[in-house]
Amino acid sequence: MDLQDAINQRHSIRQFTDKPVEKKMITKIVELAQRAPSWVNSQPWQVYCAMGDTLQAIKNAYRDQDIAGNQGNSDLPVMSREDWASQTQDNMKQWRHGIVHHFANFDEAHEKMTNASNTLYDSPVILYITIPKASPDWSIFDAGLFAENIMLAATAYGLGTIPTYNSVRFPAILHQTLNVPDDERFIVGISLGYSADTTINSYHSERRPVNEILHFN
């Protein structure tokens, strides 16, 4: 698969099969992703791969937090969507509109999306990306470049992905379960696996026309 195909075919997968992903494949994906650029080649990222019993322990602990009514407290701050810029609010509104019309009605869309999110998409693997707490904001940008490389590489190898806030909203659980040092902070979790043939996975979000975001001077 060439780069253009990988970029166009990558989209968020919200339901995975139970087919396991081999460690050898995960290693290939992460090794390829390491070619991402970073400030002075700082390469601030670490990757913690949760699978099997470890991932199930995380899912169980998250479920317990949800039952207790805890909302989570991710290492990166979360801003109310009402405070986002108008253009980004419009984009999110269009995304929600597209999701609703992809299903029979709002109730079905809400149920499917909520269940998928609450179960961490039933993914067999989550790759947790961290950076040192002693990092500039630019390291978050670098981690994003690295994360995109992971998702493109996974697509090229026939796997699906979705990067989520939901996977990192209880960092204390992750530090304990994954044995992550306290001086690292969680940036994102990328669910990884083989895509299930379901309605929720056939949705592809739209993008703004390029002339609305590209400005020649």
Stretches with model-predicted labels:
Residues 1-217:
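Acidic, surface-exposed loops and disordered segments
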